[in-house]
A protein has these predicted regions:
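Claisen-condensing/thiolase-fold acyl-transfer catalytic domains that form or cleave C-C bonds
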Residues: 1-111
Length: 111
């Protein structure tokens, strides 16, 4: 349980024609600490760009709307960094869902 973001992210990256190296900011669901660390390790995500404002343990884990919280946090941080971010500027929002499922969305900042 909790590793669903790994294949979901890999699939989203393939569909977008990107690699994990193209991602400059990531918000990963932190259902529990070791789960987020396992996902980061498997995907090769740096702690410098992942959950930069804290994960669900710090910010809260709103059951039923975790995806909305993760995407909103990602977009707010992308907007904050946009003036100095290299282009193209890509962010990743990913979360685990019950019984091993996962979701991933790649956001491209256009400005």
């Amino acid at each position: 349980m909790g590793l669903g973001p790994i294949p979901a992210t890999e699939k989203a990256l393939r569909r977008a024609g990107l690699t994990i190296a193209d991602i400059q900011l990531a918000e990963i669901n932190e259902a529990f600490a070791v789960q987020a660390l396992a996902v980061m390790q498997a995907l090769g995500l740096s702690s410098d760009i992942t959950n930069v404002n804290g994960g669900a343990i710090a910010l809260g884990h709103p059951l039923g709307c975790s995806g909305a919280r993760i995407l909103t946090t990602l977009i707010h941080e992308m907007r904050r960094r946009a003036p100095t971010a290299p282009r193209p500027f890509y962010g990743l929002a990913a979360l685990c869902v019950g019984v091993g499922q996962g979701e991933a969305t790649i956001v491209e900042w256009l400005n």
